[in-house]
Amino acid sequence: MSVNYYNQNAQAFFAATKDVDVSSLMSRFTPNLPAQAHILDAGCGSGRDSKAFLAMGFAVTSFDASHELAAVAANYIGQPVQVCTFTEFTHAQSFDGIWACASLLHVPASQLPHTFAHLASLLKPQGLFYCSFKYGAHDEVRDGRAFTHCDEERLQRFIAHSGLVLRETWKTTDLRPGRENEYWLNALLIKE
């Protein structure tokens, strides 16, 4: 459902999100990574964050389930973007960090424990995992997209058997203009 939306609206989504300033979120993530870390941008969307990480000198591998968004992102960042879902993605090497900004929220709640465990298997020991969800404890379908909202308690349930431990959570307002009344749960997780 959500993939079809992004395939049909890739250019509009790219235009609406590529200039959103998420540096305040990245500033909680990047200082905790080794120099020249390899980051997985999981569900990279427009490629905005991949491009920023590359500009910071990090190695970045990106994927998205939407083939149209992946093509737009690949053009934007100047390197390939793999087309696959979270649980389809595999890689020969482990990552220092995983960045899943506003992407895991499209995974049904029933599949998130397995999805977190799969992604955790791609991290190096003590690897860092950032994720963000619309804040709440419910699921909804809106504008042709499925959303899994998440609060602190729900996140703990999703990661309980994943090999990840919670380092910190914080709430923010939506960074896109006109959405200041929407709240997000941000989390930093560590692989045990």
Locate each region found by the language model.
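A short acidic, Gly/Pro-enriched loop at the edge of an enzyme's catalytic core
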Residues: 87-98
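Conserved S-adenosyl-L-methionine
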Residues: 164-175
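Conserved beta-strand signature within the Rossmann-like core of class I S-adenosyl-L-methionine
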Residues: 126-133
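A short glycine-rich, Lys/Arg-flanked "PGG" loop and its adjoining helix->strand segment in the class I
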Residues: 113-125
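Acceptor-substrate binding/catalytic loop of class I
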Residues: 139-154
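Conserved class I S-adenosyl-L-methionine
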Residues: 1-34, 36-45
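Class I SAM-dependent methyltransferase SAM/SAH-binding core
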Residues: 46-88
